[in-house]
């Protein structure tokens, strides 16, 4: 009876672009929802304090903001794994290839993006602080040392660690969006916004990072709302999640 009723439901998009599915993932508890929203929100607030600059004069940008520079990047060491947990939780109960790809992609994101943050953020901050304590050092020498370190092939803007870590997050975001749309009845806005947010978050200084995290929060709310609506309108005979 369940199979027959499920097959009778056409796999067409509804008015909001979401697709009916045979079963819905378990609803998030209030605590889980607070975690899904709170982590990106606090991360966005932290990134608002990220020192500015174009990246071509890193010593000059950071020399008077060393404490803030270090606090932001040490904080990011906490939020990187927490964001991975957020995406993993968002995919709870969702099956399919896209969901598996999204979960696997979180591993290189956490490993390599964290390594990049340690060196590019904390390492640069410590180096700038030490150079500030050497008044005999020529200003040009300080600038060159910091710039050369920050542009090293492993940790530069398009270096090995940052590139692999960023690609991990982007792939995880895109795959998660596809999985939620195809297998969890999410509206089409969810994969679109997740892809955009992943791209913006990897360019983490403001306004990009905070904007991407804000879009991520909007995506979570859209998905949760669609899940509530899908459960409320599920036809008789279609299995509901407990």
Located regions from the model:
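Cleavable N-terminal export/targeting peptides
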Residues: 1-2, 11
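Hydrophobic, aromatic-enriched alpha-helical segments typical of multi-pass transmembrane helices
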Residues: 3-5, 17-241
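N-terminal intrinsically disordered, low-complexity tails
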Residues: 9-15
């Amino acid at each position: 009876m369940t199979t027959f009723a499920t097959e009778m439901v056409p796999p067409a998009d509804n008015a909001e672009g979401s697709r009916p599915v045979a079963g819905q993932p378990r609803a998030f508890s209030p605590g889980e929802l607070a975690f899904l929203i709170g982590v990106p929100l606090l991360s966005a607030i932290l990134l608002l304090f990220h020192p500015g600059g174009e990246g071509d004069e890193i010593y000059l940008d950071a020399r008077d903001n060393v404490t803030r520079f270090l606090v932001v990047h040490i904080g990011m060491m906490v939020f990187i794994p927490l964001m991975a947990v957020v995406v993993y939780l968002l995919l709870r109960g969702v099956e399919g290839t896209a969901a598996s790809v999204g979960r696997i992609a979180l591993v290189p994101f956490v490993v390599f993006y964290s390594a990049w943050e340690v060196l590019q953020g904390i390492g640069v901050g410590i180096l700038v602080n030490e150079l500030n304590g050497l008044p005999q050092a020529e200003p040009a020498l300080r600038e060159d040392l910091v710039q050369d370190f920050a542009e090293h092939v492993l940790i530069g803007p398009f270096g090995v660690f940052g590139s692999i870590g960023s690609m991990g997050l982007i792939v995880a975001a895109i795959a998660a969006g596809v999985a939620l749309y195809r297998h969890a009845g999410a509206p089409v806005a969810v994969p679109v916004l997740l892809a955009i947010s992943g791209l913006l978050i990897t360019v983490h200084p403001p306004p990009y990072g905070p904007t991407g995290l804000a879009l991520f929060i909007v995506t979570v709310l859209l998905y949760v709302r669609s899940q509530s609506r899908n459960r409320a309108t599920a036809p008789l005979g279609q299995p509901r999640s407990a």
